Every structure is written in C-alpha cells, then in structure tokens.
C-alpha cells in the first residue's frame, strides 16, 4: 500500500511539473510573439518609414543606450541617441535615404512585464538612388519593460560588431 501511495504521489508531482513547464513554455511563446509584433516589428517599421516619433515612442522615458562596438565605449540617455539619429529618420521620411533594420535572437528571457533579448541586428542604409551608404551587423542586448500594455526599451546595449556568419547562425 505504501508503494501505491508513493507511486501515486510521484505520478501526481510529475504531472504537475509537466503541466507547469508546458504553461511556462506557452507563456514564453506568447510573450515573444507579442514582443515581435508590438516592439521589434514596430522598430523595423519606424526605421524603414522614417517615423522618428514612432521610434521614440518605443523607448522608456529613462531609457539608456550603451555602446561598446566601436572605439568609444559609452553609456548615455536614449534621448541623446535619438537626437543624433533624428536626421537619418528625417532623410528617410523625405526619401533621401532608405534604411532597414532586422533582428535575430539567440536568447530571450522574461516574464509578463520584463524581457531581456540577446541577438544581432542588421542595419542597412542606401541613398536616394539606391547606393549602399552603410551596412552592419551588431550584437545586441535589450532590456524591455511592459508599461500600460506596451513594451518599451529600458536599455539597448550595442555590444560588438557581428559578422554575416554570426547572423546566419541565428536563422
């Protein structure tokens, strides 16, 4: 009889563990899908359309940009980064340049209101005639928070240059 109780207890605990794991996995997939649609797709859209205000709206008011991919290792408010990027958005909106950004991820962790996303972004910029001005792959980490039903960037960390091979490995 003790063996039966032990067996049933073990079976019940296993069932509960599997059920919890499946529920967590489904919640993770839902969060990732929501972030893909409402955050990363919005970043890509705003860059492509030159929608500066739309891009700015994806950032938390206290967001920080960290860059260690070039010679100058820096950390500063996203508002400063946005001021530096604004002309590129305006040029894109006016058709003077064509910009595009894509994202791929190697790790995505979080819960209902926080997310830490690790991956690579691929940015291209062409002039109005289609000539390539800039192209680059960059390792990225982003810390996101969900406020009032909207995912916002709290910290973007542009870590290091990546290669096309690194990018392809994340397919």
Residue ranges and their predicted role:
Residues 1-27:
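Bacterial Sec-dependent N-terminal signal peptides
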Residues 64, 119-126:
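Generic short beta-strand segments
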Residues 21-57, 170-171:
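Short, low-complexity N-terminal intrinsically disordered segments enriched in polar/charged residues
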Residues 59, 69, 119-121, 157-158:
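A mature extracytoplasmic/lumenal domain signature
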Residues 137-168:
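Short beta-strand edge/turn micro-motifs at domain boundaries
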Residues 107-115, 144-151:
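A short, structured loop/turn motif at beta-sheet edges
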Residues 30-34, 38, 52-113, 132-135:
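A solvent-exposed, acidic/Ser-Thr-rich amphipathic alpha-helical stretch
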Residues 27, 128-134, 163-169:
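A short acidic/glycine-rich loop-to-helix N-cap element
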């Amino acid at each position: 009889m003790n063996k039966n109780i032990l067996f049933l207890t073990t079976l019940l605990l296993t069932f509960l563990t599997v059920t919890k794991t499946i529920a967590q996995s489904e919640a993770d997939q839902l969060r990732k899908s929501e972030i893909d649609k409402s955050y990363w797709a919005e970043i890509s859209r705003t860059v492509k359309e030159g929608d500066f205000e739309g891009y700015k709206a994806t950032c938390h008011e206290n967001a920080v940009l960290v860059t260690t991919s070039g010679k100058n290792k820096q950390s500063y408010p996203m508002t400063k980064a946005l001021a530096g990027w604004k002309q590129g958005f305006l040029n894109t909106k006016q058709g003077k340049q064509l910009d595009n950004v894509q994202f791929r991820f190697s790790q995505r962790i979080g819960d209902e209101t926080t997310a830490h996303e690790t991956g690579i972004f691929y940015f291209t910029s062409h002039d109005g005639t289609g000539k390539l001005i800039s192209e680059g792959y960059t390792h990225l980490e982003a810390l996101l928070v969900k406020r009032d039903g909207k995912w916002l960037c709290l910290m973007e960390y542009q870590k290091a240059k990546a290669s096309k091979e690194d990018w392809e490995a994340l397919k």
